[in-house]
Amino acid sequence: MGAIRAQKTAARNVGLGLLALLLTLTACTPSTPPPGGSSQATGSASASSAAAPSAAAPSATASVPGDTDETGPPQTGDKVISSKIALDWSWPGPGRPFKATHENPVPISPPPAAPLPTLAAIGAGQHPAETPPFDQLSFRFSGGFPSYDVVFVPELLADGSGLPVPLPGTGAILRVVFRGAQAHTADGTASTVKSAPAPNIGYKALTSYAPAGDFEGVLSYGIGVGRPMGTVTETKVRVYEVEKIEQGQHLYVVAIQLDSTQWK
């Protein structure tokens, strides 16, 4: 009987030893993380990727150079729907204009809406920290993008009369002609432009601007470029097209950007 009790005691001691060993090993082994345990790190990586979209292909919600001179404080619901570079940095000199064509039905909307894309506001802004630095004048239309031409001219002439339109103190003149567009009410008695900077802007590259015509679907502006210099500078131009919701309005923005490197 004593021998049997000794065997049982030994067996019990071996079992307790094995149990203690298993508990020790379990304590040294890391537990399996719960599902989603690494979601915070993954989310941070995704947020970083979304915060730095490629400049070559701006996303529909990214802030782009064509969206940086809003004519009023941002509101809830403001967003960029799409943006693209219509003309990359180049010099649209005399005889080599840049032309953008947009096909719109006429009328573009049923009455009482305007039959053509209508200029609602003009904005201006400086961007000295960009590469290259630039000044910008943006034309904000309702209804759609009009077609347009951009070209440097020796003199700004008024549509119809052909009389010179003064733009004093500028080194060059960039003419912008919007086709299939208007900036007046249906009865022709008032302007549709609700917000615009003073004509004498006074930036380094963008010195001033002036209207040159608004008749039969042709809307013209002259942009004064740079202070007079000893030599004629071929100021490079870039054009952005941005479709956006701004202050509750659906706008189509044509942003004219002027390289201000020469006037730094």
Which residues make up each language-model segment?
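Long, low-complexity, serine/threonine/proline-rich intrinsically disordered regulatory regions
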Residues: 15-17, 31-35
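C-terminal motif of bacterial Sec signal peptides marking the signal peptidase cleavage site
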Residues: 24-27
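Intrinsic disorder/low-complexity segments enriched in polar/small residues
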Residues: 8-9, 41, 71, 242
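Bacterial N-terminal signal peptides that target proteins for export
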Residues: 3-18
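Extracellular mucin-like PTS domains
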Residues: 37-64
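Short linear recognition/processing motifs and adjacent strand/loop elements at protein termini
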Residues: 29-31, 59-264
